[in-house]
Structure formats: structure tokens, C-alpha cells
Design a protein with these regions (language model features):
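Substrate/ligand-engaging "lid" and interaction regions
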Residues: 1-467
Length: 467
């Protein structure tokens, strides 16, 4: 949903406004996907951008025509077609958005896998095929929400080049002829409209049904880090989109502000809010306790430790409430919960640790957010199946957690632990956090206390205790 509501949208505008005449070929990162449906519609789909812009309500509908087709590389014929695209003279740009867990080096991936499981391994295969075909280098735009996403992706590709024993000429091609750019994406994309009544009303209004209908907020910014000469290659400045899509030599100020404030707010409150019975982000903004908890976390624990202009950060934080309160978008908390382990590590843990370094004490709300994360992943576990870890919340319904398999297996294995044992096991799992979090003074004791409060009195009482 995100790539279609963001990347393909900007290229669609470039086609219209700059006569770019480009097409996007989508490639599924995993076997289940929308390839068949997208191809049945010849790449066409309806996008609604909804929200507020300059104080005015916006509800724009656009049929996106920048997608030519979608390939599922887990099917042999499509894998071969992917390699045909790799060797095409027309290929100029590759864009990735495989979540925080996507840019990883997995040594189990082999050169002859069709396809390998990790995205960097797939990309290495694609670039090697292109190199052997004698084609020019490409521009790689990584959109994953990790620090130095472009550099980290290039690092993974180089690891596969070494592991697979590929020639030095190819390594030079990747590192010199190809351009790996980091980028920052900022648009909330809930995906499809889930209210059957609203879907029926739109179908009646526009005269057609679109099972690929996508929804995003009207706000959108894409910051690409690289040589500003890329502005002459990419179509966006020519299309007059430079306020929304632009190249800068250093995107770190934009990145840190967005990930720590906007994304950090999401991961910081949604897991506890879901356990408290909420399902939609907007509804959380109408609850004084959750809103107060989020604003305290942002304004007292996150913004003050950012080495950026404080007024700009406060304005950005203030806009978060408006964006989350979008009347058009039913952004489900469960959709945000995807890969929350790596999300908390990337979005919240840096603010948490830097706050402690600056203030010499634990940040109240960020500390609570970690306990809420553990509570969400361990709440009345029912089973572990192929779809994920099935838990049950107090409201009565089951929910399925999607995360790396090792994370789900970990929580399933510890489902009968008492609270202190579980907290200690989670905090000492360095595969999850990159360090032993029990070494943070007072953090383990505080998390045991907070998780106990959530389990005994509920997440809402826990959030209220932070205010």
C-alpha cells in the first residue's frame, strides 16, 4: 500500500507535469501479494489522498497509471521476467520499502536461490544480472526507516558479493557505477478503506469498484540524500514537486525529526492503546489520557533532546496530532503494530537512551512504552502459526502479531514466564536490541513494575500513571 500511495504517486505526477513517460514495475518482497490483482487491472488503481492542507479539508481522488505490472519472483516465470527487467536499457531507478526488518544480511541466502529470502540478496542478483548484460548502473533509492538506509543496503550487497565470490569488476560496478541513496519518506498510508458502507458509497459515486483502492494522507514529503545533481536526473524538480520531493546532501535533520517524533509517537502509544480496547488512531486522539501521554512523551522526552531547532520540532510535533486526527483515515492500530520490535529499537530506543544520557534518569513515557510493547507481545498467547503469534486482549478478540519469526518464537517460548523472568529475558536478548538493556540503570525494575500495572489494572491505568 505504501509504495502505491507514495512512490508510484510521485512518479505518476511526474508523468503528468513533466512529460516524463516513466513506468513502475512492482516486485513483491514476499510470496503472498497483489500481483495477480494488479496485473488484472493493468496496473491501474484509485488513490484517495485525504486530510487537511493549509487549514482546508482535502479529499482528492486520482487514478494512478504509472504502474505497468507487478511481478511475483516466487513464481519461476515472474522471477525470469524480473531478470529481464534487470537487463533492460529502460531501467533507471530501483526503489525499496521493505520495513525496518528488510535491510538485513542473511548468510543463508545463496546466489542460486530463486529467489533468496532477503531483499538485499534479491537486489544483488538483479544487479549482477544487469552487470553481466553490460548495462549502465542504476539509481537506488532506499525508503526503509533505518539510519543510513542507502549505505546499509549497499553494505549488505557488498557482503553478498563477498560471500558469493563474485568478481571485483562487479563490486566496482555496484560501488561506482550505481548510486545508492538514502531517503526519508513521510506520509501516513492506512491502505484500503475497510468500512463496507463507505466503499459502497464511493463505488456508487464514481461508477466502478476498485479492489486495489488505496488511501493516504494528503501530507507527503520525500527527502532523498545525495548529490544535488540528481535533481537533474530525477523528474521531480522538473515537475514542480520540489516542495515535496527533493535531493539534499544531508537528510539527517529531516530523518531524525520524522522518525523520532512522528513514527516514535505511533510506536510509543499504539500497542498499549490497542490493549486498552482502541482500534483506530483517530479515536486515540479523542481520549484525554492517550493524547496526554503522547504529547508528554513528545514534548518532554523526545523534542528536548533532538539537536535541531526546537521551534521547528515543536511545530512538527504539534502537527502530529492533526495528522493522527485525520477525519478521513481509519488508520488501524494493528497495521502499525507490524514489526514493532525493530520499530521500537529504531524509533524509540535512541530517544530513550539519549534522554537518560542528558538527564540522568529514565523518561517516564518512553519507559512505559517498552512495557506496553512486552505486554502486547505476551498478552494471553493462544498459539504460534504460519500467520504469526496469536494473542487475546481484554476486549475479547484475538489478534495476530506479525514480526520476525525468531521474535515470535521467543515470545511463544516464554509465554508461561512470570513477569520478572519475562522482562529479564526480553531485555537480555541482544538480537532484538543490539545490547543488553538490563545494563540501563533502573530500567529492568521499572519495566517489571510497569508491566505488572498493565497486567493488573490495564494499559489505560498505566498510561494515566505517567501523567
Amino acid at each position: 500500500s505504501f509504495l502505491r500511495a507514495f512512490v508510484d504517486y510521485w512518479f505518476d505526477l511526474a508523468n503528468e507535469k513533466a512529460d516524463w513517460n516513466g513506468k513502475c514495475v512492482l516486485v513483491q518482497p514476499i510470496a503472498p501479494g497483489l500481483a495477480k490483482m494488479i496485473n488484472e487491472q493493468e496496473g491501474l488503481y484509485t488513490l484517495y489522498l485525504r486530510g487537511s492542507e493549509n487549514g482546508q479539508k482535502v479529499d482528492d481522488k486520482r487514478v494512478i497509471s504509472s504502474v505497468s505490472r507487478c511481478l511475483n519472483p516466487y513464481e519461476k516465470a515472474d522471477y525470469e521476467k524480473m531478470m529481464d527487467v534487470a537487463a533492460s536499457d529502460d531501467l533507471e531507478i530501483i526503489v525499496s520499502n521493505t520495513t525496518e526488518a528488510g535491510i538485513v544480511y542473511d548468510p543463508a541466502c545463496q546466489q542460486n536461490d530463486c529467489p533468496p529470502s532477503s531483499f538485499p540478496a534479491k537486489l544483488t542478483q538483479v544487479l549482477y544480472h544487469r552487470y553481466k548484460a553490460g548495462k549502465k548502473g542504476i539509481i537506488m533509492l532506499a525508503c526503509e526507516l533505518i539510519d543510513n538506509n542507502g549505505k546499509e543496503l549497499l553494505k549488505c550487497v557488498n557482503q553478498y558479493i563477498d560471500q558469493w565470490g563474485l568478481e571485483d569488476g562487479f563490486k566496482k560496478y555496484v560501488n561506482e557505477d550505481c548510486t545508492f541513496c538514502g531517503s526519508l519518506v513521510d506520509r501516513i498510508v492506512p491502505g484500503r478503506i475497510r468500512d463496507p458502507k463507505e466503499v459502497a458509497e464511493l463505488e456508487e459515486k464514481h461508477g466502478y469498484a476498485d479492489p486495489l483502492l488505496d488511501v493516504g494522507e494528503v501530507f507527503g514529503v520525500w527527502v532523498i540524500e545525495g548529490d544535488t545533481k540528481l535533481n537533474d536526473i530525477l523528474p521531480f524538480r522538473k515537475a514542480g514537486l520540489e516542495d515535496h520531493v527533493f535531493v539534499t546532501p544531508d537528510m539527517s535533520p529531516y530523518k531524525k525529526r520524522k522518525v523520532r517524533i512522528l513514527n516514535g509517537a505511533h510506536t510509543g502509544f499504539v500497542l498499549g492503546a490497542y490493549l486498552a480496547g482502541f482500534d483506530i488512531v483517530r479515536d486515540c486522539m479523542h481520549d484525554e489520557t492517550i493524547l496526554g501521554y503522547m504529547n508528554k512523551m513528545l514534548l518532554q522526552e523526545v523534542v528536548p533532546i533532538l539537536p535541531l531547532d526546537q521551534d521547528d520540532c515543536k511545530k512538527f510535533a504539534a502537527a502530529v496530532e492533526d495528522r493522527f486526527n485525520n477525519p478521513f483515515v481509519n488508520h488501524e492500530l494493528m497495521s502499525i503494530s507490524l514489526n514493532s520490535t525493530s520499530k521500537w529499537r529504531a524509533r524509540n530506543m535512541p530517544s530513550f537512551l539519549e534522554y537518560i544520557e542528558k538527564n540522568g534518569k529514565l523518561p517516564t513515557c518512553l519507559t512505559m512504552s517498552f512495557a506496553a510493547y512486552i505486554a502486547f507481545y505476551s498478552n494471553n498467547i493462544q498459539e504460534l502459526n504460519d500467520k504469526g503469534l496469536v494473542c487475546k486482549r481484554a476486549k475479547g478478540n484475538e489478534y495476530t502479531i506479525s514480526d520476525d519469526r525468531y521474535v515470535l518464537e521467543f515470545y511463544n517460548a516464554h509465554k508461561d514466564d512470570d513477569i520478572p523472568t519475562l522482562v529479564h529475558a526480553v531485555m537480555t536478548n541482544e538480537q532484538m536490541w543490539g545490547q543488553d538493556l538490563t545494563k540501563v540503570a533502573g530500567f529492568e525494575e521499572a519495566t517489571v513494575k510497569n508491566l505488572t500495572l498493565i497486567r493488573e489494572q490495564g494499559a489505560m491505568a498505566a498510561y494515566k500513571s505517567c501523567l
